[in-house]
Each structure stands twice: as structure tokens, then as C-alpha cells.
Regions:
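Hydrophobic helix-and-loop "lid/oligomerization" segment in the mid-to-C-terminal part
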Residues: 1-154, 167, 171-179
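The C-terminal output helix
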Residues: 162-164
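Long, low-complexity segments enriched in small/aliphatic residues
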Residues: 182-184
Length: 184
């Protein structure tokens, strides 16, 4: 297997650009940007639907969010990305999954490392309600009996009663222009 020369000129695969030429690098870049845009549209649509679930069920009153993605028409491959978006928006550890035929909620967790709860995975394991939680401290796969979800909410609300997930958290979003050496 060899390397592909990014400067090599090839026929464009861009819609409406029949007969035009572009470099491999241009084509790969365009395809990646388009894939990311599709992924973001799906993620944003899913987050909007989950916002309704959270609002209708007053789930944001809990210390953690446990959400059901069964009604979402998005790929299972985006579960972690969507959970990360919800965790960032609500500033709470989030579990997002789908109900399996055997009655388990299975999916992805995303924690908030900048909060007092540094290891969401260990917290969940310590509850004794989880079938499994495997992965990183704040990004992992999980499984819990659907019947244990309310028990986990009770456990989390009690154990995390004094944790303020907004405390000490400041979101900054800005663009720096110019020479980085000018920043002091």
C-alpha cells in the first residue's frame, strides 16, 4: 500500500461539477466537511427532540440525565456525540441509550470532568444498579435494567445533592485573530 499524493489532480465528484478537476486534498477535505455537517445536523435534531423529553418529564430537576433515544431517528453511532451535546448543554452527567428487547437501557455516558464529579463511570458502578459501565471515566458504554432507572435517579439525587454542576464552570467561545505572539 502506498501513499496518495494530495496534490494529484482527479475528476471532481462534486454535484454539478461534471468534467471539472480538483486535487485529492480538495476532494477529501470537501467530503470530510460534508460528512461533519450531516453529522451535526443529525446531532442537533436529536438534541432538540431530547430537549422535549427533558422538559416534558422535568428531567432537568435531577442531578444526572438518563435519556431514552428510542424515538430518535439517528444512527446508533452518534449516541456518544449526542450524549456529549446534552451533557454540555445542561452541564450534567448524561446517560443516553435505547431499550433492548431484554429490557435493558443500553448506550453511552458522558460526564463533566470540570465538575466536582470527576469520574461518572465509577459513580455509576458504585450505585450497584448498573449491569455494566465500561470505558473511560467520563465517556463509556453502559447497560442498566429499565426497571432500575428510577432507583438510579433516587441514588444520584441523594448522593449528589450538594454538588452544583454549574459552579466554577465558565463557557468561553471566541475567535482569536492575528499573531498568537501578540497575546499576553
Amino acid at each position: 500500500m502506498g501513499f496518495i499524493d494530495g496534490d494529484k489532480v482527479i475528476p471532481s465528484t462534486k454535484r454539478g461539477a461534471k468534467g471539472e478537476m480538483e486535487t485529492v486534498a480538495e476532494q477529501v477535505t470537501r467530503n470530510c466537511v460534508n460528512a461533519r455537517s450531516r453529522q451535526n445536523r443529525e446531532k442537533d435534531k436529536a438534541i432538540e427532540l431530547l430537549d422535549i423529553q427533558i422538559s416534558n418529564n422535568c428531567l432537568d430537576e435531577n442531578k444526572i440525565l438518563i435519556l431514552n433515544a428510542d424515538e430518535l431517528s439517528v444512527s446508533n453511532n452518534l449516541t456518544g456525540l449526542i450524549a456529549m451535546g446534552i451533557a454540555a448543554k445542561y452541564k450534567k452527567p448524561t446517560m443516553l441509550g435505547r431499550i433492548s428487547p431484554d429490557g435493558y437501557l443500553k448506550g453511552s455516558i458522558r460526564g463533566r470532568e470540570e465538575s466536582e464529579l470527576k469520574d461518572f463511570k465509577s459513580f455509576l458502578k458504585g450505585s450497584d444498579y448498573m449491569d455494566f459501565v465500561e470505558g473511560h471515566a467520563n465517556a463509556a458504554g453502559f447497560s442498566i435494567k429499565e426497571s432500575d432507572v428510577s432507583k438510579l435517579y433516587d441514588y444520584a439525587n441523594k448522593e449528589l445533592a450538594n454538588v452544583d454542576f454549574n459552579e466554577g464552570f465558565y463557557e468561553a467561545d471566541f475567535v482569536i485573530q492575528g499573531n498568537y505572539s501578540e497575546i499576553t
